[in-house]
Regions:
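Short beta-strand element of the alpha/beta-hydrolase
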Residues: 69-79
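Bacterial Sec-dependent N-terminal signal peptides
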Residues: 1-24, 438-444, 458, 485, ...
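Gly/Ser-rich "nucleophile elbow"/oxyanion-hole loop immediately N-terminal to the catalytic nucleophile
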Residues: 68, 131-145, 149-178, 193-198
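Cap/lid segment of the alpha/beta-hydrolase catalytic domain
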Residues: 80-96, 111-141, 397
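C-terminal outer-membrane/trafficking sorting elements
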Residues: 447-529
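C-terminal catalytic histidine-bearing segment of alpha/beta-hydrolase fold enzymes
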Residues: 305-439
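N-terminal cap/lid segment of alpha/beta-hydrolase-fold proteins
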Residues: 21-68
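The feature captures the conserved acid-bearing segment of alpha/beta-hydrolase catalytic domains
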Residues: 206-312, 321
Length: 529
């Protein structure tokens, strides 16, 4: 028993100091990729005939890393809610060069990264404005549903499946690229039904909302309807920080500063033709037609700053924030946006503007995704295979030129440079939002009597009950085995009583770390048969 007590004390000290590492800023690990993991199943309308579709995620992990409570980043790709090639673009999949590069950069720093696919399909070529707007909103709605299902899949894997990916479900980041940015933003703030039934989201002919929950399911895809299957509904869809690269938000009123909302940071190009920098029309590359008036990254981040959602980001260590002086300069720079002629300040806190000149080689060339790149020879092979298999007539040269139209000097070096700048913005803010220990965070380790903790039974067979004083609601419970591995976690509890099921835990001794707002208690629990 004395040896067990010493082990308990040593392990407790390890758990308390593990988050003090600053490893999430520098590349340290080789990266392992596990492809085509199914995180859920839902109804797709892509072919015109509703049918169940497997939703997949590629998971990138730091090889040789012993930690089991790592932060999770979920990356959503671009693509205009249509498959690559069909969208008139080269990109639009979780295997895009940009997606893979960001995933590898994050995993090499100690993050676990999931690059996920969401349901696609809408009517971009319809001559009917209502059809274009309505089906695009429905596509974005499905994408937000799938994003939330993906979050819940990973939380379930910790609570029920023994934490196979070694993550802490209370440290989740959404990272959206282009179209994926709509999901990273929307998944953070679309929490009320009234937000998707604003007048701009009403069919002007039928006077009915474009979004019908009796068909599409609720905001979280936790209800079953003709076009929605629930996935992992017992778990929270909450996450802690949203990073956006060139996406937009359906309406700025969706941001309302609720406690449930994450922090927000992002980048955007001033001459983006397809998504507004500040606010303006959304134009889809497939047809270059207007779809909806939306709020761009610059205004989204400013709104989040003003509402208090980003207050915690005021504590970002200036020694880590290498873009701080540049951001401060943009905050005092008055600019006229080249496409909308809006006269605004170029910058705001937690945002970086890529102010790319709209004139390139004497011609007007708006650029919105300079972080993208592709290989023409590889594209030709892919197009040949797709045409042979599906009877299509895509032309690789045409697709290549479509891409160059808004990225004329496209190259891997250029793309990586823009990604590197985005990482410099994101990483110090992820450190704070995810409480990664890149800097000190005020939380006190206390005795169980301080928070009035009662737990039992000990030993337990199927579940353990945790209770605290009214003024100390439980935020999360993390369970570690005696080797220090995180084997179970329950987050977003926010209650004074919680019954934790055993699920797949083997008989033996464990340490339960219970966290309230500013207190931490570690207690031993035992399961037997």
């Amino acid at each position: 028993m004395k040896k067990l007590y010493i082990l308990f004390c040593l392990l407790t000290m390890v758990l308390l100091t593990a988050d003090a590492q600053r490893r999430y800023l520098d590349q340290m690990f080789p990266v392992v990729r596990t492809a085509d993991v199914v995180y859920g199943k839902n109804i797709s309308i892509l072919t015109g005939m509703p049918a169940a579709e497997d939703l997949k995620v590629d998971i990138y992990t730091p090889a040789g890393d012993a930690k089991t409570d790592r932060p999770l980043v979920l990356i959503s790709h671009t693509g205009s809610f249509l498959p690559p090639l069909y969208n008139g673009q080269v990109t639009g999949a979780r295997t895009d060069s940009t997606v893979i590069n960001i995933a590898a950069a994050l995993a090499s720093r100690g993050f676990v990264v999931g690059c996920y696919t969401y349901r696609l399909g809408w009517l971009p070529t319809s001559p009917d404005q209502n059809a274009r707007t309505g089906t695009l909103l429905q596509a974005a709605y499905r994408g937000i549903q799938d994003t939330r299902s993906c979050i819940r899949y990973f939380k379930k894997s910790v609570a029920e499946d023994g934490n196979p990916y070694g993550i802490d479900p209370s440290k989740v980041c959404l990272w959206g690229i282009g179209t994926g940015g709509y999901l990273a933003l929307g998944s953070g703030c679309v929490n009320d039904w009234s937000e998707v039934t604003l007048p701009k989201f009403i069919n002007t002919q039928t006077l009915l909302p474009f979004i019908d929950s009796t068909l599409l399911g609720n905001l979280y895809a936790t209800t079953q309807t003709p076009l929605c299957l629930p996935n992992h509904p017992a778990y929270s869809s909450n996450f802690q920080i949203s990073i956006n690269m060139g996406g937009a938000l359906g309406d700025s009123s969706w941001l309302d500063g609720e406690a449930i909302e994450p922090t927000y940071a992002g980048v955007h190009c001033t001459s983006d033709f397809f998504a507004p920098f500040y606010e303006g029309p959304v134009i889809v590359p497939t047809t270059n037609q207007f779809v909806i008036y939306a709020t761009g990254t610059r205004k989204c981040i400013e709104t989040a700053n003003n509402l208090g959602s980003n207050d915690i980001l005021k504590t970002v260590d200036p020694n880590l924030d290498v873009l701080k002086n540049l951001i401060d300069g943009q905050k005092s720079t008055q600019t006229i946006l080249p496409l909308t002629q809006q006269n605004i300040l170029l910058g705001t806190d937690n945002f970086y503007a890529f102010d790319i000149p709209i004139i390139y080689n004497g011609k007007v060339v708006p650029q919105g995704s300079p972080w993208e790149w592709w290989d023409l020879n590889t594209l030709k092979v892919i197009v040949q295979i797709v045409n042979a298999q599906r009877g299509t007539n895509f032309n690789a040269d045409t697709l290549h030129l479509n891409g160059l139209a808004t990225n004329p000097d496209m190259s891997a070096n250029k793309g990586r440079a823009y990604i590197d700048t985005t990482l410099r913005l994101a990483l110090p803010r992820m450190c704070v939002s995810l409480n990664l220990g890149c800097q000190a965070v005020a939380i006190e380790e206390v005795d169980d009597a301080v928070i009035g903790l009662n737990l039992g039974p000990i030993p337990a067979k199927s579940e353990v009950r945790f209770e605290t004083k009214a003024e100390y609601p439980i935020e999360s419970i993390h369970v570690y085995d005696l080797n220090g591995n995180l084997v179970k976690a329950h987050t977003d509890i926010n209650a004074n009583r919680y019954v934790m099921p055993r699920h797949s835990l083997q008989p033996g001794f464990y340490l339960a770390q219970l966290k309230t707002k500013d207190k931490l208690v570690t207690k031993q629990i035992i399961f037997n048969d």
